[in-house]
């Protein structure tokens, strides 16, 4: 069994293989060739018009990635939405709503449950106040959002670089600190599609992944406070030395635990759970002394049953030059008549 707070040995081995062109990656390389052929064929079908992309009547920004696993797309989406709001835009957000139990197209309301709409869309809706819709087909979500909120004049798609059925005007590609890995496609490498490929802007947490698009380095750290379900904030320094249980149901839970350690918090136990984990069957540690510490994404699922759980927000540092470049591209869209 993997140590608490660490990925499973299999996950660690595969993640390691994705960073190097070693024996395991080489063994999987023939499957990557097949995956690459299928990906190229699908793109060709859209490029030739045999499959059609639906264009919505407002500009569409897609924030996504080309690597498997967590790249930090949702915090970037939230940052983009807040920037657009500050610039006078009226943005809406569309998403597939990964991890939800429903399959229909629906609006994400602050009172929605994560089981109905997905944890990331619910977090975005509560944190931004922007209208959010989820659907398997993003274009359907966009149409429904614009019908319900006709004042919306721009859409941000959380994830969806590979969802070619939705036409887009601007693509933001996000990389974590592992970049493009060994440069191979799944399953021999982390890439969902070949890289480099044409995108408008790149945000990267590690070294530059290469490619011709303008690139901007971002950094992540935890905020200096935690918050409970009622909105009460607690300085993190007050949790130093306190008995606690940290948990994270995100793509890279060890990153969250490491950031807690960097803030001087050493939980007595750490629990790594699968991304989009359903907490309905989760059992709280029996030790009543332990304070629950979690991510914002997990809090939207934990708070209904555990309102005392302390969510630690992620502080994302994106250089102003990125937003300047974003604004410039949006201005060019406006001048071209979109």
UniProtKB/Swiss-Prot annotation:
Q: What is this protein called?
A: Tetraacyldisaccharide 4'-kinase
Q: Which GO terms describe its molecular function?
A: ATP binding; tetraacyldisaccharide 4'-kinase activity
Q: Which GO biological process entries does UniProt record here? A: lipid A biosynthetic process; lipopolysaccharide core region biosynthetic process
Q: Which HAMAP family match?
A: LpxK
Q: Which EC class does it fall in?
A: transferase
Entry similarity comment:
Belongs to the LpxK family.
Q: Which reaction does it catalyse?
A: a lipid A disaccharide + ATP = a lipid IVA + ADP + H(+)
User: Its biological function?
Assistant: Transfers the gamma-phosphate of ATP to the 4'-position of a tetraacyldisaccharide 1-phosphate intermediate (termed DS-1-P) to form tetraacyldisaccharide 1,4'-bis-phosphate (lipid IVA).
**Pathway(s):** Glycolipid biosynthesis; lipid IV(A) biosynthesis; lipid IV(A) from (3R)-3-hydroxytetradecanoyl-[acyl-carrier-protein] and UDP-N-acetyl-alpha-D-glucosamine: step 6/6
Binding residues for ATP: 67-74
